[in-house]
Structure formats: structure tokens, C-alpha cells
Amino acid sequence: MVTVYVLLSIKDKATYVGMALNVLSRLKEHNSGKNRYTKAHMPWKIIYTEQFPDWATTRAKEKYLKSTAGKNWLKKYFDKN
């Protein structure tokens, strides 16, 4: 299973959307400063995950979550929860 995830910066409330086979391992990479964008906003915490059976479906969801419609959906999702 491949997971799409959303991270929230504890420092400045920035968000980051990505996908990985092992989300916890990927979170450690983000929090160790190995990614240029996420390094500036460390530390991060996982706020949303969703699993899919293949990379293509996961990539489509990631692309959606990065779109304006997806950002609006995430905002509504977290306003409810």
C-alpha cells in the first residue's frame, strides 16, 4: 500500500503533501532537514493519511490535495474534526 500524507509544521503552521511507502520513515527524513522546503519549517507532524493500492491512484490523490480544491477540502475536513 502507498500512503498520501499531509504534514503540518509545528513552527509556523505550513502544510506539506507527499506520498510514501513508509510514512513514519518519511516523516523522520522531513524532520532531519533532508528536504529543502520542509527543512525551513521543521518540526513536522502528520495530520492526515490515506492509503491506496498503487502509485498511480496515490499520485492522483496527492495532486488533488495540492490543488485549490484539495486545499479547500482539507480546510473543511479539519474545521469539522
What are these regions (language model features)?
Residues M1-N35, A40-N81:
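GIY-YIG nuclease catalytic motif and its immediate N-terminal context
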